Design a protein with these regions (language model features):
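Conserved C-terminal helix/linker of AAA+ ATPases
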Residues: 1-19, 62-66
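Helix-rich C-terminal "collar"/helical-bundle subdomain used as an assembly and partner-interaction module
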Residues: 18-99
């Protein structure tokens, strides 16, 4: 299984794995990764924002920020935060260029 201690800290290796799936537009793998992780959505949004510069093209950063802000806000009202977070990752996969 997945080491939840590593995911709570949203390690670089966990992020790299997720980013790899997103770069490949592998929706199924992203969904599986998210389902197996127990990362807190608020923690995720912050960590993804902090580490995104290393993985997202500069020209895509404004779009990334807009997606993260929108879904971070919606998270407060989401009946199922995992679905909300998956929607966020799906939009980022569709709209952002990965390095």
């Amino acid at each position: 299984g997945i080491d939840t201690g590593i995911l709570r800290n949203f390690s670089d290796s966990a992020l790299a794995k997720l980013i790899g799936y997103m770069k490949d537009k592998n929706f199924t793998a992203v969904r599986k990764w998210l389902g197996e992780s127990d990362i807190e959505p608020t923690e995720f949004f912050r960590a993804f924002f902090d580490k995104a510069e290393d993985h997202i093209a500069k020209g895509s950063m404004p779009q990334l920020v807009l997606h993260l802000a929108k879904y971070q806000y919606q998270n407060a009202f989401a009946a199922d935060p995992e679905i909300n977070l998956m929607a966020c990752l799906t939009e980022i996969m569709a709209d952002c260029e990965f390095l």
